[in-house]
Amino acid sequence: MRPGLRRGARIELTFLVESWMKPHLEGLVKHPLYATWAMVYHMETVSRALLAPYLESHEEAVGGAVLVKHLGPAGVRARVRV
């Protein structure tokens, strides 16, 4: 691993919620809100973007845990920051 990664490092991703980010759950959920699985996807995406500059070409990263907390609903076309 390349040097430089420090505790507390941050990166942000801002995007608009799209319809593909809604819950699908075999038709059981119909609300037009940002889904938990999409939130985890975006959390994993920003985590990888933060780590990528420090990985050597032969290295890979594996997550150990994800803690998700919805602070408020976000509808389709809402701006979200992860």
What kind of feature is each model-predicted range?
Residues 37-39:
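A short mixed-secondary-structure module that forms the rim of ligand-binding clefts
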Residues 1-35:
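Catalytic strand-loop segment that frames the active site of acyl-thioester-processing enzymes
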Residues 47-81:
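Hydrophobic beta-strand-centered segment that forms part of the acyl-chain substrate-binding groove
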